[in-house]
Amino acid sequence: MRFSWKNICLPISCINNTNQKKTTTTNPPKEKLLLLSRQTSVPSRVYMSDFSNSTISLNDFSNSFFINIHIFTYEELKTITQGFSKYNFLGEGGFGEVYKGFVDDSLKTGLKDQPVAVKALKREGGQGHREWLAEVIILGQLKHPHLVNLVGYCCEDDERLLVYEYMERGNLEDHLFQKYGGALPWLTRVKILLGAAKGLEFLHKQEKPVIYRDFKPSNILLSSDFSSKLSDFGLATDGSEEEDSNFTKSVMGTEGYAAPEYISAGNLTTMSDVFSFGVVLLEMLTARKAVEKYRAQRGRNLVEWARPMLKDPNKLERIIDPSLEGKYSVEGIRKAAALAYQCLSHNPKSRPTMTTVVKTLEPILDLKDIQNGPFVYIVPVAGVSEVHEIKCKDDVKVVKEETEKDAKVFPRHRAGRRNRRKHKAMRSRAVYSDTALYKSLGTSLYNPAN
């Protein structure tokens, strides 16, 4: 049976497309919506817990609380994504599919010309609506350089869509584990995590703290200069000023990132986000995922395997991402490892606040004890019988490595399956230097203020 959004009382006025055919019903009743209770004084922000049976118009709501949020029709979003074409498909998460589009002033007055990402939430089950609502309420009111910008939304009949700014470099997960474009240099990793930490700090410092609850690499989006922004606020929730009083019966999030006290007792606080941050920091150091089920039992859970080695300088080097090839600040690695150790404490009160995390990460960007010398990019070239070294303008060496013996040594008629496998071209491996990225992206790569 198909689930209908109309079965749910909506907290935000949902628009009806004026181009749709009129129904046979005459004088349809005006839609009443669940919204904020009317109060004698206007609150500084709308909270999920503030909704009651009182009603308020969309205009009153949006003008009072939303910041530069546009309301789109479904047809408008269908047009800008070329009918949600597979050629515009960016990816799919737990809450829906994402498509690329482009908006400008001709679509909506005052709309900035920009590429956008349109997320169409799945309609199966009631939880999807709550997630859509959380994103509209939180991102519609809170603006920060390290939170993804919500351009607008669509709430039309059964459709629930969100329109975000488009982030050119995708998410951290792809760069860290798939190594798109090569392994991320050390300083770039620090910059990304510092930006994400500033985003969490901003959420936690609200009058009523916002608990993100789903901090992980796939939710950290990257701009062209590797500035990071938090996205996907579907699981975010309002915290309490009394941290010890936050308990929930439903544990939500992603395996491997949730804090132990949240899993075992449902105790959800800002310190739960700090634990998740520690997991991602550990992933950044090791380039290993939080949970890798293909490994032996002892090494499947990254925190259990790596945390004991974070405070031992002799063991720490063993777990550092080998693709960094030693091109990192030794002091910076140790400081980051010590911070991860604190964030991953089983005692929530022993974890640092996100303000402390930010203050710890900022000086690491200025450490200069990084090994000199460029990274090496190995390019396999079939048929080359010797190794050539080429000096490039940006001091990045390019090496052509022999991958195939001369045909005279291995005649074709003797090249059986074994030999073909033996001389199969190597997969290329690219690691770009901080120096090269600095030249191409500018000083913003190292600017802690970003």
From Swiss-Prot:
It comes from the Eukaryota. SUPFAM superfamilies: Protein kinase-like (PK-like). It catalyses: L-seryl-[protein] + ATP = O-phospho-L-seryl-[protein] + ADP + H(+); L-threonyl-[protein] + ATP = O-phospho-L-threonyl-[protein] + ADP + H(+). It is an enzyme of class 2 (transferase). Keywords: ATP-binding, Kinase, Nucleotide-binding, Phosphoprotein, Serine/threonine-protein kinase, Transferase. GO terms for molecular function: ATP binding; protein serine kinase activity; protein serine/threonine kinase activity. The active site is at 214 (proton acceptor). InterPro entries: Kinase-like_dom_sf, Plant_Ser_Thr_Prot_Kinase, Prot_kinase_dom, Protein_kinase_ATP_BS, Ser/Thr_kinase_AS. The modification Phosphotyrosine is found at residues 164, 262. Its EC number is 2.7.11.1. The modification Phosphoserine is found at residue 218. Pfam families: Pkinase. Coiled coil: none annotated. This is Putative receptor-like protein kinase At1g72540. It comes from Arabidopsis thaliana (Mouse-ear cress).
